[in-house]
C-alpha cells in the first residue's frame, strides 16, 4: 500500500521545517560573531549573510539544495572558525560536496535516520525526525 502525496508531504514538510529551523539558528548565531558583527564588515561577508537570509526564504527545490551546498561549503572554506556552530544535519541535508566534510560513521547515522523516516512513511506510522535523531545520537 502506498501513501498519498498529501501524506508524503507531511513527512517531508516536517523534515524540511526542522532543517530550515537549524539554518535559521545557525544564521542568528553567526551574526553575533566576527566577522559578521563588526561595524565595517567587508562586502564578501555581507553577501554571504544576504545569501544565507535569501536561502531561508527560498522555496524548497533543486536550486535551494544547490545554493545550500554552496553556502555550507563556503563556511568550511571561508569561515572555519564557525564550523563548531554549523549543525552537522545541514551538511547531510544539503548533501553533495557537503558530504566530504562528514566522516563515514556520521553519514551512516544520517542514512539510518532517512531510512527510518521512509519506513514510517510507507507504513503510515507517526514519525518525529527530531526524536529519532536524538535517540540515534544518544541524546535520549
Where are these regions (language model features)?
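Amphipathic protein-protein interaction modules
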Residues: 62-121
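Short, well-ordered helical secondary-structure segments
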Residues: 10-13, 35, 39, 81-82, ...
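Non-catalytic interaction surface on structured domains
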Residues: 45-60, 71-78, 82-86, 95, ...
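Alpha-helical oligomerization segments
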Residues: 115-140
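Charge-rich, solvent-exposed alpha-helical interaction surfaces
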Residues: 18-29, 47-55, 67, 71-75, ...
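A generic structural signal for ordered alpha-helices
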Residues: 4, 8, 26-33, 50, ...
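Charged, low-complexity interaction regions
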Residues: 33-42, 57-63, 80-81, 104
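Short terminal alpha-helical segments
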Residues: 2-53
Amino acid at each position: 500500500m502506498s501513501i498519498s502525496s498529501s501524506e508524503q508531504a507531511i513527512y517531508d514538510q516536517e523534515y524540511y521545517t526542522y532543517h530550515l529551523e537549524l539554518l535559521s539558528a545557525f544564521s542568528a548565531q553567526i551574526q553575533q560573531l566576527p566577522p559578521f558583527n563588526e561595524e565595517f564588515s567587508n562586502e564578501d561577508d555581507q553577501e554571504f549573510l544576504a545569501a544565507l537570509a535569501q536561502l531561508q526564504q527560498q522555496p524548497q527545490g533543486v536550486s535551494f539544495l544547490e545554493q545550500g551546498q554552496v553556502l555550507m561549503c563556503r563556511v568550511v572554506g571561508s569561515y572555519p572558525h564557525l564550523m563548531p556552530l554549523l549543525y552537522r544535519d545541514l551538511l547531510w541535508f544539503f548533501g553533495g560536496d557537503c558530504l566530504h566534510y562528514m566522516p563515514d560513521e556520521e553519514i551512516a547515522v544520517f542514512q539510518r535516520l532517512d531510512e527510518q523516516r521512509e519506513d514510517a512513511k510507507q507504513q503510515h506510522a507517526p514519525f518525529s525526525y527530531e526524536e529519532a535523531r536524538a535517540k540515534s545520537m544518544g541524546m535520549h
